[in-house]
């Protein structure tokens, strides 16, 4: 009887020793571990590839503002829209090339008649008085052509989207704005140049005006008055004397 028990115990131990080891108990560096690592790496790489392909097929949704600006750049404008243009300002220019710099003392206009279809630009020389040396401006200002204005305030104080590029008869025109502003955006303690600070308070500030510009209204282009910087002026007030 005892011999039978010993035989069963030995057979049981031999069966346990011959049984395949589980993957959890496989030592590091064994073939089973290498196969498992390769399989997991392949699955991870495949998952990243699938995720990347999914992102390409389904790109992240753009913001409403970006979509509006994109549509403003790609919209095709009817040439008849320029025939309805009124209140033309020399500070607004549609051109296929950068306008002359302000130091050239030229004012550039956009031709609203048939010549616009030929992308012609007319520049006329203005007569400027000759300044003597030693003359200074009360406020220092800078004037530049702004080429990438996308946002502005209309005459009602509401924000509007300004068209940067205009597609007219398969030609892309850029909308430029000639703006003038104070060189120093913050008022200086000394005030305006040449103003007697003993009797007057003064500071330089940028003033604005409204010009007709091509803007986006929904999904179509329309003319609207927008506000741009046009001058740097001196604001003065009399100092109150204490008696």
UniProtKB/Swiss-Prot annotation:
List localization entries: Secreted
In the UniProt record, the signal sequence range is: 1-18
Please give the coiled-coil regions recorded for this protein.
none
Region: Disordered; residue ranges are 47-69
Example GO molecular function: lipid binding
Please give the positions of the paired cysteines in each disulfide bond. 139-204, 182-232, 192-234
What residue spans carry the Basic and acidic residues bias annotation? 47-66
Q: What does this protein do?
A: Nerve growth factor is important for the development and maintenance of the sympathetic and sensory nervous systems. It stimulates division and differentiation of sympathetic and embryonic sensory neurons as well as basal forebrain cholinergic neurons in the brain. Its relevance in the snake venom is not clear. However, it has been shown to inhibit metalloproteinase-dependent proteolysis of platelet glycoprotein Ib alpha, suggesting a metalloproteinase inhibition to prevent metalloprotease autodigestion and/or protection against prey proteases.
Tell me the subunit arrangement. Homodimer; non-covalently linked.
- The identity of this protein, by name, is Venom nerve growth factor 1
Organism in which the protein naturally occurs: Pseudonaja textilis (Eastern brown snake)
């Amino acid at each position: 009887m005892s011999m039978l028990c010993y035989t069963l115990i030995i057979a049981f131990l031999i069966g346990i020793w011959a049984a395949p080891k589980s993957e959890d108990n496989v030592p590091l560096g064994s073939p089973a571990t290498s196969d498992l690592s390769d399989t997991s790496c392949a699955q991870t790489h495949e998952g990243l590839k699938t995720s990347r392909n999914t992102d390409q097929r389904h790109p992240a949704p753009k913001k409403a503002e970006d979509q509006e600006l994109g549509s403003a750049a790609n919209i095709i404008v009817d040439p008849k829209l320029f025939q309805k243009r009124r209140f033309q300002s020399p500070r607004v220019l549609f051109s296929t090339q950068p306008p002359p710099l302000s130091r050239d003392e030229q004012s550039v206009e956009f031709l609203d008649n048939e010549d616009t279809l030929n992308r012609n630009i007319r520049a006329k020389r203005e007569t400027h008085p000759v300044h003597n040396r030693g003359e200074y401006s009360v406020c220092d200002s800078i004037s530049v052509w702004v080429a990438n204005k996308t946002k502005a305030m209309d005459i009602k104080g509401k924000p509007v989207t300004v068209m940067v590029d205009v597609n007219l008869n398969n030609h892309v025109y850029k909308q430029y704005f000639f703006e003038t502003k104070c060189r120093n955006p913050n008022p200086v303690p000394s005030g305006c140049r040449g103003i007697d600070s003993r009797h007057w308070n003064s500071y330089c500030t940028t003033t604005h005006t409204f010009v007709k510009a091509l803007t986006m209204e929904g999904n179509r282009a329309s003319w609207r008055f927008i506000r741009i910087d046009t001058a740097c002026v001196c604001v003065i007030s009399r100092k109150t004397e204490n008696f």
